Amino acid sequence: MRVLGIDPGYAIVGWGVVEYAGNRFAPVDFGAVCTDAGVPFERRLDEVYTGIKEVIERTQPEVLAIEKLFYQHNQTTVIGVAEARGVILLAAAQAGLPIYEYTDRKSTRLNSSHAT
């Protein structure tokens, strides 16, 4: 099974693709979609959406794993991340990917225990 893992954001969206077979994870690809703070926010959302669509098309994952949104003290930041997360989920849904949501703590533990 090929899994695309996403750490959502609107400035930087981290992503990694792993192949899972026979109780083993193998890294396939990784990167980030970065947006420029100097452009309008709606343009940044478009860049996130387009970037994630390109990653999905290029890496052909079977499922998407994404961090759940958690409350931050800065409401402006949490709203922006929620909006970016929305366009990421849209790209995944349009590609027909099942979506699995995890807490940041669990996904960090999973990623670090299988990192190479």
Regions from the language model: what does each represent?
Residues M1-R109:
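Phosphate- and other anionic-substrate recognition elements at nucleic-acid/protein interfaces
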Residues L110-T116:
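Single conserved hydrophobic/aromatic residue that forms the stacking wall/gate
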